[in-house]
């Protein structure tokens, strides 16, 4: 029984491996990571800035998917993926019961990117690998 628990703990530790890319010694805004199929890579983005992911020169992006597509622009170009947070429009619908019956009122509003609501995942599939990312919006002063 102890062997089964130990094996399960070891397997779970690989599932939650988060790879925080190392920053360049020349410019802290540039970061890099070595691919490991068992890692989730963290990307910290800022509002008003474009981030770029560069994959191997022999890789081509086949597909991208994110859990919050309304809040992120993803632009693919060969082995490059450009990422930018964006505001999105949504509607608030309220139903009211009055003496006459039910009525609905809706109001459209824009939700600006913010660190609390803009956390999601990103999956990139290339012709060679599948990458999984944690996509986070960080404060401007980070």
Where in the sequence are the language-model features?
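A general "mature secreted/periplasmic domain" signal
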Residues: 18-142
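Sec-dependent N-terminal signal peptides
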Residues: 4-13
């Amino acid at each position: 029984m102890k062997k089964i628990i130990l094996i399960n703990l070891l397997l779970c530790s690989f599932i939650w491996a988060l790879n925080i890319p190392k920053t360049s010694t020349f410019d802290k805004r540039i970061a890099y990571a070595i691919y490991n199929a068992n890692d989730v890579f963290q990307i910290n983005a800022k509002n008003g800035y474009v981030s770029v992911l560069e994959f191997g020169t022999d890789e081509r992006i086949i597909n991208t998917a994110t859990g919050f597509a309304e809040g992120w622009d993803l632009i693919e170009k060969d082995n490059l993926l450009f990422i930018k947070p964006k505001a999105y429009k949504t509607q608030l619908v309220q139903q009211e019961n009055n003496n006459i019956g039910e009525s609905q009122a809706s109001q459209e509003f824009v939700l600006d990117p913010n660190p609390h609501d803009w956390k999601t995942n990103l999956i990139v599939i290339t012709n060679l690998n599948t990458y999984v990312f944690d996509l986070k919006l960080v404060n401007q002063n980070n």
